[in-house]
Structures are given as structure tokens and as C-alpha cells.
């Protein structure tokens, strides 16, 4: 899907190079030299691997778990077809979901919340957990230890755009469609970095994969 480097699609190559080699606090480069000798030219944007070559099988993850890779190899050796799960992370997460469904009335970052309730769904506690939009390949390791999912395994096969799916889930949890007193812009204002939150690992594979100039 492009991974974390894909967030570079929010800037031009020139902006990235200037920030990395000239403007960064740790860089001493008074002449403003951009390294270029024997350095390959950067493409205009990061692309998912599927746009660069034909893919027979993609095992997602950043990085993929060793047991998932091992099982994939064993499946091939048995002459069987590898099938990735179509379920999302919430379906395997051990945390308790409210009987009436997920609901939010605030968004908090983890340091603002403090220590989450040990067994309750993180979304209902105000944390943006990417579980609803992420494929269930990791065993919900992060939510199990009270860290919200960041979406590093990418979407399920049923989802075209991981970030869009999560934005829809947040809007639903807030009751934006049902409660007309909830202002969508007010909800969005509670997120300091919308793209970085919803597309940390998949921006290059999104329906809109880069900042439009």
C-alpha cells in the first residue's frame, strides 16, 4: 500500500528535499546543497507495489508477522490457495463492545485519556482505533495491550479505501447522520492530523493518493 513513506505524497519532491537537507534543525548545510551524485532521482510520488508490477500474492503488514508469512509458505507447499481473511480487526479483538453498538461523543489522544479501561472497546473511550477498517491478520495485538490500532495491515478485501472506511465509521459512531445537532466539522476539528491518522500506511493506494496541487 506504500507504507509510512507514502505520507510524503502530501508534499512535492522539492519540498521534501528542502526540508530534509536544508531546513531541518539537525542539518548543517549552509550552502543548501541537495545530494545528487549517484543518488537515484525521486519519482513524483510514492506508488503502491501493485502499480509498479503484477502481484501474485500480497501479505500485508508493517512488517508482516512471521507466523503469517510461515503459514503462507506452508499453504503454498501444500498446493493450496492462500486466502486472506475478509474480517476486520474488531471481529477478533477481545475488548468488549457495547450491546447497542459503538458510539463516541469525543475524540481523545492517548495521553489525554490516560490509562484506558482494561476490557472496554477503545473507540467507545474516545480513541481513534483503526480496527473497523483494518484486516484481521495481527490478532489484535495492539488493542489487546490498550494501544489503538494504526492500520498497519491495511484494509480488508471488501474495502477500497482504508481511510474513507474509517472516516465513515467515525461519523457513524458519532451519530452524524442520525443526530443533526452533531456538526461534522466539529468532529473533524478534534483530529490534529486527519491524513496521518487515517492513512498512515495506505495513502499511495487511496482513491486520492496524493495532495492535489
Regions found by a protein language model. Give the residues of each.
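Iron-sulfur (Fe-S) cluster-binding modules
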Residues: 3-59, 63-213
